[in-house]
Amino acid sequence: MEYFPTPAYKRSILLIRSVLSNEKARLDAIAREKGRKQAIGEDNFAEELPKILEFCDSYQNAFMRYLSAVLPQHSSKIQCKAGCGNCCHHFPMSVEPFELIEFYGNIRKSPDLLSYLEDCHFRTKAYYALLQKGMDACVEDPEDYALVNYFNKGLACPFVLASGSCGVYSTRPVTCRMYFSETPGEFCVPEHLLTEKNRSFIVYLPDEIEEQIADVSAHYADLGLPEGLYEGLLAMNAFESSFANAEKILESSK
């Protein structure tokens, strides 16, 4: 859907553009100082972590302001309600590296961390098995085949509570924040996914903003983080010592 440029829309675009532009300038300066293309590497991850987390919060808050500007433009009322969680059975992709970092930072001290990682591993294996099956069968779009069939498996996100609500709502990535439905949750299930009864939709950002996001994320390329949430969190676990070092840096600066 193409949104009408209301004053609220324009202000939200200016905000998110400014947040991304400032962060890119900061990362560009670090890269120049380091004499390399990417700003963030294992050598300065711990040192830069506080700024990364600060930026991620600003980015997600700006996106929420964008949602506030565009959702009222939809003719049908959004039917999403707390405790539904049906969309949380999809395999979450397109998670930015700085969001993975913030997400892992918020769960790393949880007593359920090991269980979370085991569940992430199981779901990642399930998705890639379906992807391989689609490629072996020479389907037209193996990724779409894998995503649809993964949803059919009914595997809830490891971070969904028994109540159906999100257990990490405040730090959920933008890929989770952009998913909505104009139909009740009873139609956001596998049997209705590809039918007219399901009117779920994704709120996309303008292409120019997506390009800015890509420019910021490019500075994390040396970390080699996957774009899927589950496999990304598994990869983040390898940076545990960097998080511990960042804590020491913060403590020493107080």
Question: Where in the sequence are the language-model features?
Answer:
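Short loop/turn segments that flank or connect secondary-structure elements
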Residues: 1-254
